[in-house]
Curated annotation (Swiss-Prot):
Keywords, ordered alphabetically: Bacterial flagellum, Secreted
Record-level GO cellular component terms: bacterial-type flagellum; extracellular region
UniProt keyword annotation of Secreted present: yes
Protein location: Secreted; Bacterial flagellum
Family named by the database record: Belongs to the bacterial flagellin family.
Other facts: Individual Salmonella serotypes usually alternate between the production of 2 antigenic forms of flagella, termed phase 1 and phase 2, each specified by separate structural genes.
PANTHER family xref list: FLAGELLIN
The protein's role, per its UniProt record: Flagellin is the subunit protein which polymerizes to form the filaments of bacterial flagella.
The organism of origin for this protein: Salmonella enteritidis
Annotated protein name in UniProt: Flagellin
Lineage: Bacteria, Pseudomonadati, Pseudomonadota, Gammaproteobacteria, Enterobacterales
Primary location group: secreted
Length: 505
């Protein structure tokens, strides 16, 4: 090897190896501090891509497991509501068995049918109001897809069915034939129902609108009814006249009234600024014109100044008999409380049902209009008639409420085979509950499988991207030793060119 000083090959070789060990040491320290074998794509490009796909699957499957739990909750919510529907159906069946017994009176059958109707209405309420996160689960047929995988199409479908009285085939279910109609039935079963209740207070008769509660007289041309503000009596006047106060009138009085002479006498005998009382009112003498009694006095009523003017007393008159009196404002006495007011009338409030009752009004029959026909209801509202015949409420085959008279009702029979109808409804509810129970078990299985898959994927990803501390500690120790050795050897290599100097001596 030639002896040169410009290029130190041994030093360069040593530096290169030292850089390699430095890089190895940095990599080992980075992995040990992060716990990851792959901290960037350069560490393992293929491994990073594989681990990233594992991460996507793990996150997707973890969310899918939560979705499956939501699916279980939906099924449990629906099944719980169906359990209540089942309980109501069981009670309806029990009542139906009771109703088929020949020992029941008409009153017994009516009571049984009333409870059956309440149970059926509760079934409809449960159907309409049961929901999960805003989704009604029993009010319509619906298929709800639950994503239980990390990829498209990996779903489980929950079949939700409409379960209500109509879908169960119990619409119009009756063990006692058509039900005698009441006012409440008319209001709840039909739209745009109008009419009025009649009331009598002595010889006076009134109507109360069944919708607005407005009270009018019971006449061909009804008048609106009010409550007298003074005495609480019923009246058709919308206001009551307040009593004018003679002392305070804007029109000039005739000469020599008691009020005019009294005020004139006070002015004549006093001076400006003096006060005096008259009829319970305190006045102040504002102006005194001469010594004859002419002038002005004032008082304050309800925060406003009212001035009385005395005039027409001749100069030098020895008495005040010619005095006239005029007020700046008309003042009245309220019929309600007897206090001064500037209003000539007090408004009456519109009458309400409670006002009729306060005046001992007695309820009479009602007139109810449904679909253009006017029906008559008795005072208690539990009997509806038309042309002298009692009306019954019935339902058509399509479930639409209708009114029929007693003749048509007599020809109607109770629901045929009521127990078979209930059993059919129970079977349908059982089928839906069984389906929901099976879907819950399926979700449980899916959740278990998802958990196992996530565990295995985490293990696989760990083998790719997690650091092996035993290996990395060994690599770090090796790199540290190589660093120390390389540094020492580099010092020796840098001394090699010094040997050339011996040739120059």
């Amino acid at each position: 090897m030639a002896q040169v000083i410009n290029t130190n090959s041994l030093s360069l070789l040593t530096q290169n190896n030292l850089n390699k060990s430095q890089s190895s040491l940095s990599s080992a320290i980075e992995r040990l501090s992060s716990g990851l074998r792959i901290n960037s794509a350069k560490d393992d490009a293929a491994g990073q891509a594989i681990a990233n796909r594992f991460t996507s699957n793990i996150k997707g499957l973890t969310q899918a497991s939560r979705n499956a739990n939501d699916g279980i909750s939906i099924a449990q919510t629906t099944e719980g509501a169906l359990n209540e529907i089942n309980n109501n159906l069981q009670r309806v069946r029990e009542l139906s068995v009771q109703a088929t017994n020949g020992t029941n009176s008409d009153s017994d059958l009516k009571s049984i049918q009333d409870e059956i109707q309440q149970r059926l209405e509760e079934i409809d309420r449960v159907s309409n109001q049961t929901q999960f996160n805003g989704v009604k689960v029993l009010s319509q047929d619906n298929q709800m897809k639950i994503q239980v995988g990390a990829n498209d199409g990996e779903t489980i479908t929950i079949d939700l069915q409409k379960i209500d009285v109509k879908s169960l085939g119990l619409d119009g279910f009756n063990v006692n034939g058509p039900k005698e109609a009441t006012v409440g039935d008319l209001k709840s079963s039909f739209k745009n129902v109008t009419g009025y209740d009649t009331y009598a207070a002595g010889a006076d008769k009134y109507r109360v609108d069944i919708n607005s509660g407005a009270v009018v007289t019971d006449a061909a041309a009804p008048d609106k009814v009010y409550v007298n503000a003074a005495n609480g009596q019923l009246t058709t006047d919308d206001a009551e006249n307040n009593t004018a106060v003679d002392l305070f009138k804007t029109t000039k009085s005739t000469a020599g009234t008691a009020e005019a002479k009294a005020i004139a006498g006070a002015i004549k005998g006093g001076k400006e600024g003096d006060t005096f009382d008259y009829k319970g009112v305190t006045f102040t003498i504002d102006t005194k014109t001469g010594d004859d009694g002419n002038g002005k006095v004032s008082t304050t009523i309800n925060g406003e100044k009212v001035t009385l003017t005395v005039a027409d007393i001749a100069t030098g008159a020895t008495d005040v008999n010619a005095a006239t009196l005029q007020s700046s404002k008309n003042v009245y006495t309220s019929v309600v409380n007897g206090q001064f007011t500037f209003d000539d009338k007090t408004k009456n409030e519109s009458a309400k049902l409670s006002d009729l009752e306060a005046n001992n009004a007695v309820k009479g029959e009602s007139k109810i209009t449904v679909n253009g026909a006017e029906y008559t209801a008795n005072a208690t509202g539990d009997k509806i008639t038309l042309a002298g015949k009692t009306m019954f409420i019935d339902k058509t085959a399509s479930g639409v409420s209708t009114l029929i008279n007693e003749d048509a009702a007599a020809a109607k029979k109770s629901t045929a085979n009521p127990l078979a109808s209930i059993d059919s409804a129970l079977s349908k509810v059982d089928a839906v509950r069984s389906s929901l129970g099976a879907i819950q078990n399926r979700f449980d299985s899916a959740i278990t499988n998802l958990g196992n898959t996530v565990t295995n994927l985490n293990s696989a990803r760990s083998r790719i991207e997690d650091a092996d501390y035993a290996t990395e500690v060994s690599n770090m120790s090796k790199a540290q030793i190589l660093q120390q050795a390389g540094t020492s050897v580099l010092a020796q290599a840098n001394q090699v060119p010094q040997n050339v100097l011996s040739l120059l001596r």
